[in-house]
């Protein structure tokens, strides 16, 4: 989807005299959708951290909305799971009651995805039918809806990778793709909502607008790298900071031990974790420099205050990441780290969108 498609038009909606109310309603709906996506990411993170993601072995977009309702149905679902490599290698001897717990996490994650689909497309159709969306905004929203449908397919491709012979978890690259696409959809929702009927701030020079735009892009890259850390379980190794096995950067022989060399970026836990660390340092530096630039050139402005909030969130996220690493990824810390990443991305997207409206 192009940035032009995502950019809200300044043209008034078709409904005469309804622009303020309809735009406000659309904005509230978009922020509500963004909140649902955060909830989806949180439940997905809990599903992964509890080892529940492979408990449902089939993809049934319609009939799968109904969980097992009888003892016979539960026995059938459990039999399907017992045929998976994860059960055979990791969970042999699991009871039906234990299976029902992990099944509930994965079913809840999928059900929330279906709920988000209804919560998106039904209001979208209503707003469009009643003339409350101009063409550009409507097409941008439709594009996000298509990405949401694609996200469901990517989720199943990810799960299917973990059901292959010898696999006990999903492929890291596919988990990273699933998380990054969800994050991009979230950023798109926030971007659109932040630009609706908003009066421009004090004009910003091109330098500040570009650094504002860089922040959500860097955060998306960092989320993708975090997805690789989660998928490869790299957070369970090198549980020290700031050093990794006694060095700020481990020896290259260890970082590129896998052949071919390109696979180290996905399969070598040392390089995967190092990349996530270095990207975090880079993001923190850009956020700090951007705030300092605004503090010096636009002191007291709304842009400077937003940049300060972003810097605070990035700092908190870095502290959470370090805590999560030192504690070897407890459930609460892993979830807090994942949710805070979405908050950083959301704030950065709002700031970047407003900055693009504030041309000098």
Curated annotation (Swiss-Prot):
* Locations listed in the record: Cell membrane
Keyword Protein biosynthesis attributed: no
Q: Name one GO biological process term.
A: heme A biosynthetic process
Question: Which EC class, in a word?
Answer: oxidoreductase
Q: Pfam families from the entry? A: COX15-CtaA
- Catalytic activity of the protein: Fe(II)-heme o + 2 A + H2O = Fe(II)-heme a + 2 AH2
**A cellular-component GO term for this protein:** plasma membrane
Record pathway: Porphyrin-containing compound metabolism; heme A biosynthesis; heme A from heme O: step 1/1
- Highest taxon, organism lineage: Bacteria
Residues in coiled coil: none
Q: Where does the chain cross the membrane?
A: 29-49, 111-131, 139-159, 175-195, 210-230, 242-262, 269-289, 309-329, 330-350
Transmembrane recorded as keyword = yes
**How does the UniProt record describe the way this protein sits in the membrane?**
Multi-pass membrane protein
> Binding positions for heme?
276, 337
Spell out the molecular function terms from Gene Ontology: metal ion binding; oxidoreductase activity, acting on NAD(P)H, heme protein as acceptor
Cofactors demanded by this protein: heme b
**Keywords for this entry?**
Cell membrane, Heme biosynthesis, Iron, Membrane, Metal-binding, Oxidoreductase, Transmembrane, Transmembrane helix
What does the record give as EC number?
Answer: 1.17.99.9
- Subunit architecture: Interacts with CtaB.
Write out the similarity annotation.
Belongs to the COX15/CtaA family. Type 2 subfamily.
Known role: Catalyzes the conversion of heme O to heme A by two successive hydroxylations of the methyl group at C8. The first hydroxylation forms heme I, the second hydroxylation results in an unstable dihydroxymethyl group, which spontaneously dehydrates, resulting in the formyl group of heme A.
Protein name (record): Heme A synthase
Give the gene that encodes this protein. Answer: ctaA
